[in-house]
Regions:
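Residue-level recognition of tetratricopeptide repeat
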Residues: 14-15, 49, 89, 123, ...
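Structural motif corresponding to the intra-repeat A-B loop/turn of tetratricopeptide repeats
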Residues: 19-20, 54, 94, 128, ...
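TPR-repeat structural position
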Residues: 22-23, 57, 97, 131, ...
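TPR alpha-solenoid repeat register
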Residues: 43, 76-78, 83, 117, ...
């Protein structure tokens, strides 16, 4: 309450988050700002992210929607796509796939969020079995961020799903030239080629590290690739 402006309340909250302060809670500062200006975009977005990290996705969604309501009062396509992107994730984590899809598309209007948004769009299209659309979307993501390694894995998966195994192997090889530790692409190369040497190389590099396997498994799950 001693801080005079909403701007400084927001910046103080950001500072506390960045430096992981042991005794001060950034949420207190965002809440104070919102008690003065309930529609503040940045503080609502920040609050939503904090609730997301706690797994409180419905609470997060409410804050993102409030931020978007303010952002779109005069302009249906806001200058900042982050609240829409975060809304997409909060909806996705609640199983609201269609709402998530729409939110990610709105976020993609903003250039800064195109690679991340089109990647999430491609994941949802893959879940729906819309592989051609998903391939178009993942290409848009890679156009904005050529070294998006998760997008590269997804493209390999889609090419293989569409029976373009040779193209999948070639793209996996190109991706491994960029990052030889892209285990998603390495695994996709094995699935597309059927060569056991690819699988053995992956196992060698993974060093039986269970957490690594879990992380890469989650990447496949996020695109509905449970079988893989």
């Amino acid at each position: 309450k001693e801080i005079a402006s909403i701007e400084q309340l927001f910046l103080t909250g950001v500072h506390l988050e960045q430096y992981r302060h042991a005794t001060y809670n950034p949420m207190d500062y965002y809440e104070e700002a919102l008690s003065r200006e309930p529609g503040d975009v940045r503080c609502n977005n920040a609050m939503g992210l904090l609730w997301m990290r706690k797994g409180e996705f419905a609470k997060a969604e409410a804050h993102f929607r409030t931020a978007i309501k303010t952002l779109t009062q005069r302009n249906p396509n806001p200058y900042d796509g982050e609240p829409y992107f975060n809304l997409g994730w909060s909806c996705r984590m609640q199983g609201k796939i269609d709402e998530a899809y729409d939110a990610f598309y709105k976020a993609a209007w903003n250039a800064a969020w195109q690679d991340a948004s089109y990647f999430e769009i491609a994941r949802i299209e893959t879940i729906r079995g819309e592989y051609e659309k998903a391939l178009e979307s993942v290409e848009k993501s890679l156009t904005r961020n050529w070294h998006h390694h998760k997008a590269r894995q997804l493209k390999c998966s889609l090419l293989r799903k569409m029976k373009y195994n040779e193209k999948a192997v070639a793209f996996a090889d190109a991706s491994l030239e960029i990052d030889s530790f892209n285990m998603g692409c390495r695994y996709e190369r094995y699935l597309a080629s059927g060569e056991n040497s690819d699988l053995e190389k992956l196992k060698e590099l993974m060093r039986d590290w269970s957490h690594g396997y879990i992380e890469y498994a989650l990447d496949f799950v996020a695109g509905g690739l449970y079988e893989e």
